[in-house]
Regions:
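Conserved catalytic cores of very large enzyme subunits
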Residues: 2-749
Length: 749
């Protein structure tokens, strides 16, 4: 019998089992029209957003942190109901804060008490002595477990920054709960389903795997009950399904709020919610119980809450992931497996928040792109890119065959089947440093420690291809091995001491796991191998004979110019490293993947990487993601895109990040013309099978002015795309701002 909350909904399978894809496919309404239906912000939206902008200014004036908790450990019910301001409860169409005040950062010690306390003291807050005693004496954390088990080799590679950004001092993130489930089914049904799962796994042998799973599912059930209690604090009963659009938005947000109250993962993605919510909104519009103004207000207020998510971080984390990113990644667009466009009016509404409330890095709005998407939607998304530089594009046509048509982006660019999968985040291996180890015999140029295996160093003064390649292969093979072993240990400890119960409660118990790894310094390795192969690379040694630098004579092809000689090296490098990763056992039988992605950590990685044969000097930032090296692109934007498009997605299922800055004049004389040109660029790029594109549309002069005059009102929310996410430009360090300015801004296509 259909529940009254499901009135008018079609389909049967989703009613008898948790199956969001079946619900969505049976009930969504495609929209092929343009943006003319969109509504302006309501007075409530303007009032609330105005208050938040003032809080953001105060936060920046205080050094980046407005307020921080020191006495209460964050949890689902650690705080009572809280609102943006006094008397705003009625204005807020979506309610719920992480703590007891807006923009206040929670105290989360389970990832590591030292880090939680350091985050406090960095900004002038004194952590609780009582909590210090509890978590130092009686309660072990993820960070404690990891460092208790690390081998000397693991500590050495970490210390020498050939493995960097490992999730051993912070929450790993990248797990996307299917928050839609709370709205469609209500908590009581979800608890019952998990209880059935628990009951049906008891007949198996009580081996480690079964015992652990029983404990984890029990934790998930407790988390679901905690979510219900949390909602009751705000006066809502989420035990049953949502009855209308407002409840659907609120119920879904409560699911996400539970995640960010209990985890401080590096990526806390929202997932693919737009089409799902449109089903409820469209039903209410048809029934006459909701207007378009009210529908847009709901989405504006939901996005406002995503923009408010904050975590307490330590300085070393901020160096890697600068600008306070949350990766509240949220997808719009995409095609169904049946050939129907999945674009709805709600996809327009989410993009429209960047107009109603201005540009913002969060949520990390991602267009799942196909050239077959409705023309009006492609044009509107491109227009928003031209105006705000706030959204990224990912190729739905290469992801859909792998992940289906109900996947989410769980971090920056990596896909995961919503509610069916989880990912073990793996940071990055510095292949640029690995290349220098191949020459030095595993000795680090900065520390002079024997970090890598003591293989035979290159002895001559000229670095030949035949001498270099076997050494590089051996060194890369070693790095892949220690990389996987280190991640296996980290994720074991994270499951043990910092388990994501609130998120995994909204994912199938029989979960598929992927094991993410990553590559940093990609283009520098490609160009360096090209230099060794096609030019003459002389080794410059110091007084001890250590290979300190290189002098390259002659020309060589560079990746990023649509030159097959360089591009085939890039393809080889990706395939080779991925195959080396695959040779090793991965934790919980997870499926290994890799990415070419750096975030803003390319600056930090570069500091610890010596001179390279491609001409990159010691200490200089590495090129971000899969981008060509700085200054390498000589043949324009399209040639650069063509090079990146040759990298096979099937060997980098964790994602291939490409960030490009285009001068407005290169796209056209006005915004409409620029949007039309950008659609053509996107169609051509993605039809080649490429994976991802960050689009920035501005000139370098604007960046320079923002760097010198961050106080200007126009730059307070000036957002740019960097490798894998968006950030307010003035929130970057000066060093990172200079790095962005140094990148190619294409003046021609």
């Amino acid at each position: 019998m259909m529940k009254t909350e499901w009135r008018g909904f079609k389909g049967n399978l989703w009613q008898s089992e948790v199956n969001l894809r079946d619900f969505v496919q049976n009930n969504y309404t495609s929209y092929d029209g343009d943006e003319s239906f969109l509504a302006e912000p309501t007075q409530a939206t303007n009032t609330l957003w105005g208050m938040l902008k003032e809080l953001q200014k105060e936060e920046r004036a205080k050094g980046g942190v407005l307020d921080m908790e020191t006495e209460v450990v964050s949890g689902l019910t650690a705080y009572g109901a809280a609102y943006i301001g006094e008397g705003t409860k009625e204005l807020e169409k979506v309610v719920g804060l992480q703590t007891d005040k807006p923009l206040k950062r929670a105290f989360m010690p389970y990832g590591g008490i030292k880090m939680a306390e350091q985050a406090c003291t960095t900004y002038g807050y004194q952590p609780s002595e009582k909590l210090h005693e509890i978590f130092h004496k009686y309660c072990k954390t993820h960070n404690d477990g990891v460092f208790d088990a690390y081998t000397p080799e693991m500590k050495l590679v970490r210390h020498n920054h050939i493995l960097t950004g490992l999730p051993d001092t912070y929450g790993r993130g990248r797990i996307v709960g299917d928050y839609r489930r709370v709205a469609l089914y209500g908590i009581d049904f979800l608890i019952k389903e998990k209880q059935n799962d628990l009951a049906n796994m008891g007949d198996r042998e009580m081996i480690d795997e079964v015992i652990r799973l029983r404990e984890e599912v029990s934790m998930q059930i407790k988390a679901l009950k905690g979510l219900k209690e949390m909602a009751q604090l705000y006066g809502y009963d989420i035990s049953q399904p949502a009855q209308n659009a407002r409840e659907a938005v609120q119920w879904l947000y409560f699911g996400y709020l539970g995640a960010v109250k209990t985890q401080n993962g590096a990526a806390m993605s929202v997932g693919r919610i737009s089409t799902f919510l449109d089903i409820y909104i469209q039903r209410d519009l048809n029934e006459g119980t909701l207007t378009e103004d009210e529908a847009q207000e709901l989405i504006d207020h939901l996005v406002m809450k995503f923009r408010m998510v904050k975590f307490a971080r330590i300085p070393s984390y901020n160096e890697l992931f600068t600008g306070d990113p949350v990766w509240a990644t949220l997808e719009v667009g995409g095609m169904g497996q049946d050939g129907r466009s999945m674009v709805t009016k709600n996809d327009f509404r989410f993009l429209h928040t960047l107009e109603n409330m201005g540009p913002s890095p969060e949520p990390n709005l991602t267009v799942l792109y196909s050239s077959r998407l409705p023309k009006a939607f492609k044009h509107y998304a491109s227009l928003i890119s031209v105006k705000t530089s706030s959204i990224q594009y990912e190729n739905d046509d290469v992801m859909r065959p792998v992940w289906g048509d109900d996947y989410s982006i769980c971090c920056c660019v990596s896909a995961t089947q919503t509610g069916k999968e989880m990912q073990f985040f793996g940071a990055r291996a510095n292949l640029a440093k690995c290349l220098t180890y191949a020459v030095s015999g595993g000795v680090d140029s900065k520390t002079r420690e024997q970090c890598g295996p003591k293989y035979r160093a290159v002895e001559g003064d000229v670095l030949t291809y035949d001498e270099f390649m076997p050494r590089f292969m051996d060194m890369m093979d070693w790095l892949a091995g220690v990389y996987v072993k280190t991640l296996n240990l980290i994720h074991y400890m994270h499951d043990k001491y910092f388990y994501e119960a609130a998120e995994l409660a909204l994912i199938d118990t029989d979960v598929r796991r992927t094991f993410a790894t990553g590559i940093a310094g990609f283009s520098h390795v490609v160009d360096s191998i090209s230099a060794i192969k096609y030019a003459k690379v002389n080794i410059i040694r110091d007084e001890t004979g250590f290979p300190l630098s290189f002098k390259t004579e002659g020309d060589f092809p560079r990746y990023g110019n649509d030159d097959e000689r360089a591009d085939e090296i890039a393809v080889w490098l990706l395939k080779t490293f991925m195959n080396m990763i695959k040779k090793h056992h991965t934790y919980r039988n997870s499926e290994p993947t890799t990415s070419i992605l750096t975030i803003t950590s390319n600056v930090v990685y570069g500091k610890f990487t010596s001179n390279m044969p491609d001409g990159r000097p010691a200490g200089a930032p590495l090129a971000p993601g899969a981008n060509p090296s700085y200054g390498a692109e000589k043949n324009g934007l399209l040639a650069s895109l063509n090079s990146v498009a040759k990298l096979p997605y099937e060997y980098a299922l964790d994602g291939i990040s490409n960030t490009q800055t285009i001068s407005p004049g290169a796209l056209g004389h006005n915004d409409e013309e620029r949007a039309q040109t950008l659609v053509g660029v996107l169609d051509g790029y993605f039809n080649q099978g490429s994976h991802h594109l960050n689009v920035n549309v501005f000139g370098i002069d604007k960046l320079k002015d923002a760097m010198e005059h961050p106080e200007k009102e126009e730059y307070q929310n000036f957002t740019i795309r960097v490798s894998g996410y968006a950030v307010k430009f003035i929130d970057l360090t000066r060093e990172q701002q200079l790095d962005v300015i140094a990148r190619q801004a294409h003046e021609r296509l």
